[in-house]
Amino acid sequence: MNEKIAILSTYSFVNIEEPANLIPKLLLIAKRKYVRGTILLSKEGFNGSFSGSYENVNLVLEELIKLTVPKDVNVKINYSDLHPFQKLKVRLKKEIVAMNVDDLNVDLFKGEYIESKDWDSFITKQDVIVIDTRNDYEVEIGTFKSAINPYTKTFKQFPAWVHQNEKLLKGKKIAMFCTGGIRCEKSTSLLKSIGYDDVYHLKGGILQYLEDTQNKNNLWQGECFVFDDRRAVEDDLSPSERHTRLPST
């Protein structure tokens, strides 16, 4: 029986003084271990999603942690019959998730995590506004019941949406979510930096929530878009048959 392919997604907001210096070291170990996918590096941290054997993706993760020394790191592993990535890329970026907001220190300044087990009860409270921080094409195929869709084409448009909807957000508890946690974590940092106090986000994102809860209360509706060859996953995290042929993004 063939071994399942492990798909490891990870990120951490951590100060990296010279991120370019890490690229050759990460490329070397990932190539040696036949790992495919993408790792983004910047001065604000790292963001990666890569696939291979369980042992080998964890060896790449260990090297990434050794080189960056984060205070905490978010890690999620799923499995697939096939590699969801065709190539290996390690890239230097200005931001590990592009928002185009200067001087945002997510490592020090962010909202509170809500664990998967507490998410359903939290987002159904009367004084909580739930915001999907993903792009409109992602929201279109699945989202949480009653979540607000900002209808953004890219994450860079999210700050403008926040400023345009001050009346909607003011005085509310704001709960945000995204695929794996990184965009909603950065979104909480944005809101905290401009004066919002009660800001929360789903720890580990939609994928962790679906694994932990199996969507037992049916608050998640539809499928979850993912940025690899699977295109989308069902609420049991199996690849979507309906969206397998969607064009790559």
UniProtKB/Swiss-Prot annotation:
PANTHER family referenced in this protein's UniProt entry, alphabetically: RHODANESE-LIKE DOMAIN-CONTAINING PROTEIN 7-RELATED, THIOSULFATE SULFURTRANSFERASE/RHODANESE-LIKE DOMAIN-CONTAINING PROTEIN 2
SMART domains registered for this protein in UniProt: RHOD
Disulfide pattern: none
Record organism: Rickettsia canadensis (strain McKiel)
Taxonomy of the source species: Bacteria, Pseudomonadati, Pseudomonadota, Alphaproteobacteria, Rickettsiales
An MF annotation (GO) of this entry: oxidoreductase activity, acting on paired donors, with incorporation or reduction of molecular oxygen
Main enzyme class: oxidoreductase
InterPro entries in UniProt: Rhodanese-like_dom, Rhodanese-like_dom_sf, TrhO, TRHO_N
Protein name: tRNA uridine(34) hydroxylase
Gene field: trhO
